[in-house]
Amino acid sequence: MLAKRIIPCLDVRDGQVVKGVQFRNHEIIGDIVPLAKRYADEGADELVFYDITASSDGRVVDKSWVSRVAEVIDIPFCVAGGIKSLDDAAQILSFGADKISINSPALADPTLITRLADRFGVQCIVVGIDTWFDAASGKYHVNQYTGDESRTRVTQWETLDWVQEVQKRGAGEIVLNMMNQDGVRNGYDLEQLSKVRAVCRVPLIASGGAGTMEHFLEAFRDASVDGALAASVFHKQIINIGELKTYLAAQGVEIRVC
């Protein structure tokens, strides 16, 4: 069995790490490189960086900090933000990233997933899915351009359909960003994760809602996710990564302990 992964998420805007609640009202957390090094030193299995306004601004992720991160950490990291061509991806990978993640650009042009997978291999290609539960309809819908509140829009895709579509096109991993839960720290949406897990044959990463160590355990035990991504509990030092992994191992979760 592959070890489960603990993945701190660093949302980047204007060269700094920020964090919002339900993808809104972002506050500045700190500088990118020192935070990345701290999480690597604490025992994170990998890191994810989202340049949250790149797609809505019509630009690619700022690559200047990617190489600086690569110089100070020795764990895999994934970069996302406005990547919409093979050249964009090649540049980011050449600066030291191990994976690239696409979200809004994949919705705009689903063939991008296949072209990237064919060029760089599926192991490098992550698709991020920003999913919102609409209580009125009882359905999960995919959202686009979520880094900019004024441009966020609901797409035609229901989440389960898009999960299956991106796999057909070559996604090597899926990060499910559950917008309703984002930043509120009351637990991952286990019902949604379980529904996605049932149709997802590639590694699935849960994102949105972690507030306690038990929430991580529930995601691994009850929804069978491969990794758990979190931000605010790490940024605000509510949970220490090393202590979290010790706790999970004691609960029988297969995990790399520092």
UniProtKB/Swiss-Prot annotation:
Assigned EC number: 4.3.2.10
GO molecular function terms listed in the Swiss-Prot or TrEMBL record: imidazoleglycerol-phosphate synthase activity; lyase activity
Cellular compartments annotated: Cytoplasm
UniProt entry keywords in alphabetical sequence: Amino-acid biosynthesis, Cytoplasm, Histidine biosynthesis, Lyase
SUPFAM superfamilies the record matches: Ribulose-phoshate binding barrel
Predominant location: cytoplasm
Subunit record text: Heterodimer of HisH and HisF.
Family according to the record: Belongs to the HisA/HisF family.
The protein's name in its UniProt record: Imidazole glycerol phosphate synthase subunit HisF
Organism: Klebsiella oxytoca
Gene designation per UniProt: hisF
